[in-house]
Amino acid sequence: MQFEEIVPQCEEPKFGGMDRRTFLKTIAAAGIAASGIGAAFMLPGTNLMVMPNSKGYLVVDMGKCMGCDTCMMTCSLVHHGEASLSLSRIQIQQDAFQSWPNDIHMAVCHQCEDAPCVKACPVEADHVDIVHGNVRTIDPDKCIGCTQCIDACPWLPKRLQWNPETKKVQKCDLCANTPYLRDKGGPGGTQSCVKVCPVGAIAYIDKIPDQNDPTAYNVNLRDKAWKSLGMTDIDIKREG
């Protein structure tokens, strides 16, 4: 009996109208061509955008956060030189009508694998920065304030913020462009929110969280001190 008789031959999947072999050749060639400029790029002859994964991510423990807003103040300080909640790129929301562990929501940029905000930007201000570990960031000199990137963000609250002072959009860059941070930021460097959190409710990781799990960025960072309170093993599965 022939192999073909045992295993039915399936139609080869198509990628933007190309067969698999052509797709792989095209993406390889396009990757080489784009490696010099380091931006997300469109596959020739398709409407598919390809971008390298970020080399760093922030994860949080909403059950550990105490809502002090230190991370928000520090974020605005290292980016803008002033402590302002409205200029922070990380957002902490508190609900007085809820009790622990549902009283605080921490919202951080996911540095999405297939970033909708990057795709939506009409002027390439929102881009993949290979100089700083492929972090998804916004070039304020290119941003025209159209807010299409904010609209494209699939998360609530939106992980991109409108800057009321510059009339442009900003987002977390893992502290890659922080003129007021003494340390080197960006993937592999210092993230100010992680460094200053008094309870360790924010962590930096280099492995991409599961992009199909909306709760993957909300992890358990509680330690032995929490065990005595009986709170160590309580997983808080909410969208991070």
What residues fall within each predicted segment?
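Iron-sulfur cluster-binding cysteine motifs and their immediate structural context
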Residues: M42, T70-I92, D114-K142, Q148-K167, ...
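N-terminal secretory signal peptides
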Residues: M1-M18
